[in-house]
Design a protein with these regions (language model features):
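Conserved His + Asp/Glu catalytic blocks
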Residues: 107-108, 147-153, 159-297
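Residue-level detector of short, conserved catalytic/binding motifs and their immediate flanks
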Residues: 53, 81, 153
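Short beta-strand element of the conserved SAM-dependent methyltransferase core
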Residues: 85, 157-161, 319
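Signature for HUH/AEP ssDNA processing cores
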Residues: 61-149
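Non-catalytic peripheral regions of nucleotide-handling enzymes
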Residues: 53, 111, 305-307
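DNA replication initiation on ssDNA origins
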Residues: 1-71
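Intrinsic-disorder/low-complexity loop/linker signature
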Residues: 8, 14-16, 26, 44-45, ...
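C-terminal non-catalytic accessory extensions
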Residues: 191-194, 295-338
């Protein structure tokens, strides 16, 4: 996924990177005096393109990285489920906080995400599955978000290595089986629990909170003015999500620098390993990883030139804006099918 607001920088021979500015500006080809004073030589040091981390492309790539890691984590276990936890009217009362209605100026009550509810749920799940079901290794990836229409707080949780003895099929929605579990519902205890089988699609939907979460210098102010806590994610650590798959398949992954993912409608798609895998592999095989990086750079440069020269006659900044707008419109057109 391309960045729509890339930065330009220089990497010195000692590995230090200095960021110059936005690649969309036309003055990016020369290093300013501020960089020269830091010892950057624009003729001998390596010029690099750095993703901004904030645009639609970067956020979507970040969410896909997490979806990939969750998908690969799930491949290491026999039973994995996707849970949606919602609040009933009685239990949503403890989430209400005062806020000012911007249209009327009145003080109103709004429901805000409460991370501790999710943390307590996971603690109870792990304790019960260890004590009752002899399973001490339940792992998870979860997010807290607000509903798109009613802004009601809720949670999505992927549970890995999680056999549910009393799983009951209650519906079939858009081709997806929907289950419930009396045991899991009692452990949540604050509203409804719906359960689906986990897939790359459910992982992608869970990680999609990054597309909605505000970022940047105004983010804290926006949440403060709204009177609510931001969307968030929590996950198992030590080891991280996907680590087991990396350990079992790292030689195969980096021999071809790619991982094949099954498509929902059949076939497969090969993508680069998640950055988390890159970090692990770089620590173990620094020389091999350096070779891989050089190959990636050559491919990226060819793709970059084709993107700006072979596909458009628009000025760089206009083309980036158009690309991002098209991607935003595509995302808005998507409808939840789970």
């Amino acid at each position: 996924m391309p960045c729509y607001s890339p930065m330009i920088g220089w990497r010195k021979k000692d590995g230090t990177v200095y960021i110059y500015g936005d690649l969309r500006n036309e003055n990016w080809k020369t290093a300013p005096e501020s960089l020269l004073s830091k010892g950057v030589n624009p003729y001998t040091d390596e010029r690099i393109i750095i993703p901004c981390g904030k645009c639609t492309g970067c956020r979507l790539e970040y969410s896909k990285q997490w979806a990939d890691r969750c998908y690969l984590e799930a491949k290491m276990w026999k039973a994995n489920y996707w849970l949606t936890l919602t609040y009933d009217e009685e239990h949503i009362q403890h989430l209400l906080v005062p806020a000012v209605d911007k249209k009327t100026g009145e003080v109103i009550k709004v429901a805000s995400l409460y991370k501790k509810d999710l943390q307590d749920f996971m603690k109870r799940i792990r304790e019960r599955w260890k004590r009752v079901h002899d399973n001490p290794n339940v792992r998870f990836y979860a997010c807290g978000e607000y509903g798109e229409q009613n802004h009601r707080p809720h949670f999505h949780v992927i549970l890995f290595n999680f056999v549910i003895p009393d799983l009951e099929l209650i519906a079939n929605k858009n081709g997806f089986a929907v289950f419930q579990s009396e045991e899991v519902s009692k452990i949540w205890g604050m509203g409804n629990v719906t359960i689906n089988r986990n897939s790359w699609l459910t992982a992608a939907y869970t990680a999609r909170y990054m597309m909605k979460k505000r970022k940047g210098k105004w983010a804290k102010q926006e949440y403060a003015e709204a009177g609510i806590n931001p969307e968030f994610c929590l996950c198992s650590r030590k080891p991280g999500i996907g680590y087991g798959y990396y350990e079992a398949h790292k030689d195969e992954i980096y021999s071809k620098d790619g991982i094949a993912y099954a498509k929902a409608k059949g076939g497969a798609q090969t993508r680069k390993p998640p950055k988390y895998f890159d970090k692990l592999f770089k620590l173990e095989n620094p020389e091999k990883f350096e070779e891989i990086q050089k190959l990636r750079k050559n491919v990226a440069e060819h793709q970059f030139k084709y993107r700006l020269v072979g596909k458009t006659t628009l000025p760089r900044i206009e083309y980036y804006k158009l690309e991002e707008q098209v991607k935003q419109d595509t995302i808005k057109a998507l409808r939840r099918t789970l």
